[in-house]
């Protein structure tokens, strides 16, 4: 498509033909309204396409525009409904990359629908030929639109009341191997981990209902393990039973069975399952008093490339609106991608009620969550006891620290592995509360605790040389 302007006066009384997008959709004098949905796009225009035209094209193709003028434009008020590119900034130290700020009127979006929101913002425009690459970096949801969403089924405060645990991060573990265990052996591993001191165990995201372990069998053996561990420890325990399924009807059937077994929490793969399924399940969880753990499988397909796709902070905001009580966020110190400033930026967007604009952490807009419940951050992936001081310092209390291999890989077995993590956690929390420097004294804190815990001493020896030192790709 050429960007030269062509116009023909039609008999219908409008200018037919193709004209530059910037004539209609680039409005640098526009001041966004409090009710506008705002978006920050990282654009890489094709050679010869000015950034103003590229930004206007994004605004047009994600709102009311198409490639040519149409006579039906005369039947509505385009000035009321169109998206507007109101600012463009060059990206520092990047060639031919720009941040385009676009404002969308609220009437373009269905109330309470993340599906409709994303269909516009990250729809066909991402295949637009005028752009070599396009990435949605951040969005600002106005309070007027935020109030149309239920948000998390319960939120952080209600979850703590449900499980009666306060003043520390929660401890979890993904059962390994992730695939291949029978339901009975799976339940045995759950029991050993929970009796050893963990608060939660977890289905891997891959576990649904495969030939080696059908979902109903898994639910039954896990329920037996949880009730037995609770009776022995006097603590409330949980296991994230993955109810993700091929249909919403099957998903809800599995959720109902978990409720019948008196399970406190279930799990959903929200990206592969889809936002319609996730919002449906979130509403069910609130109505039925069940917590909802969210896994982000497939997120890196969408968010890992720096110049194309959608940043995880956008997915985080959408998940909080759609609903979930926990979500995986990366660890900063483990095996998965995540730079500290960027990671804690979207962790704050998940947990806090009001987050100020902070470009150093990738936060392009101030976000008011209008008292919506918070989502607990889950740090999971390649972490072990030596990481505990850093994890406690980085993530704080409102988090779940999830040690899979770091529990089940203990030489003495699952229960000692869980005990090692629980001792390490409580030692670090006590040291933090006493005002000790976790960054400088973390190793000493663990070694002191290990004098009274042979399980921790063995774990410290096994994983003393394990590090994951790669440069993070997700940077400002």
From Swiss-Prot:
Site location (Transition state stabilizer): 335
Keyword set, alphabetical order: Bacterial microcompartment, Calvin cycle, Carbon dioxide fixation, Carboxysome, Disulfide bond, Lyase, Magnesium, Metal-binding, Monooxygenase, Oxidoreductase, Photorespiration, Photosynthesis
Compartments, record wording: Carboxysome
Residues given in the record as substrate binding sites: 124, 174, 178, 296, 328, 380
Required co-factors: Mg(2+)
Superkingdom of the organism of origin: Bacteria
The EC number(s) this enzyme carries: 4.1.1.39
One Pfam family per UniProt: RuBisCO_large_N
GO cellular-component term (any): carboxysome
UniProt binding sites for Mg(2+): 202, 204-205
Alphabetized GO MF terms: magnesium ion binding; monooxygenase activity; ribulose-bisphosphate carboxylase activity
Active site: 176 (proton acceptor), 295 (proton acceptor)
Function as written in the Swiss-Prot or TrEMBL entry: RuBisCO catalyzes two reactions: the carboxylation of D-ribulose 1,5-bisphosphate, the primary event in carbon dioxide fixation, as well as the oxidative fragmentation of the pentose substrate in the photorespiration process. Both reactions occur simultaneously and in competition at the same active site.
Note: The basic functional RuBisCO is composed of a large chain homodimer in a 'head-to-tail' conformation. In form I RuBisCO this homodimer is arranged in a barrel-like tetramer with the small subunits forming a tetrameric 'cap' on each end of the 'barrel'.
Self-association state and partner proteins as the record states: Heterohexadecamer of 8 large chains and 8 small chains; disulfide-linked. The disulfide link is formed within the large subunit homodimers.
Protein name: Ribulose bisphosphate carboxylase large chain
Organism from which the protein derives: Acaryochloris marina (strain MBIC 11017)
